[in-house]
């Protein structure tokens, strides 16, 4: 994989959180960012990212709706998705909907970095 950087699509309406994730992973991945659910779906369909980091609570289309659409899309159905949520009760619903992993907010840079590495390794 020399010279190839996996693409991570970061979907969150909070610019500070997108930046935290990007800085945590900088130098090891290429990035695209979306600030709402519809933009996330559009970019996912266009870019076919290696991993999506997806916030549950976003404008225009929430994370569960985005996740359901990704799982229905033949080209994106197997794309690993890490769901971010501040609501512990959302964890089970996200996993049932096809999330690869669910992370509770707040999390540290090391935690998101490790989760991204692990999920990508599991995917393959």
Tell where the protein language model's regions lie, with residue ranges.
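Active-site residues of response regulator receiver
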Residues: 55
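Receiver (REC) domain active-site loop signature in two-component systems and cognate sites
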Residues: 58
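Two-component/phosphorelay signaling modules centered on CheY-like receiver
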Residues: 15-32
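Acidic catalytic/metal-coordinating carboxylates
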Residues: 36-39, 50, 62-68
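Hydrophobic/aromatic residues positioned on beta-strands within the core alpha/beta folds
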Residues: 82-84
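Non-catalytic signal-transmission and effector/linker regions of two-component phosphorelay proteins
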Residues: 1-9, 110-124
């Amino acid at each position: 994989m020399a010279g190839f950087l996996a693409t991570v699509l970061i979907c969150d309406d909070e610019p500070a959180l997108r930046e935290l994730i990007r800085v945590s992973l900088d130098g090891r991945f290429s990035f695209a960012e979306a600030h709402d659910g519809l933009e996330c779906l559009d970019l996912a369909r266009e870019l076919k990212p290696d991993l999506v980091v997806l916030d549950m609570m976003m404008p225009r289309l929430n994370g569960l709706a985005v996740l359901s659409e990704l799982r229905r899309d033949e080209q994106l159905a197997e794309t690993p998705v890490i769901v971010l949520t501040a609501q512990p009760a959302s964890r089970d619903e996200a996993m049932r909907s096809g999330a690869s992993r669910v992370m509770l907010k707040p999390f540290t840079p090391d935690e998101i970095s490790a989760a991204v590495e692990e999920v990508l390794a599991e995917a393959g």
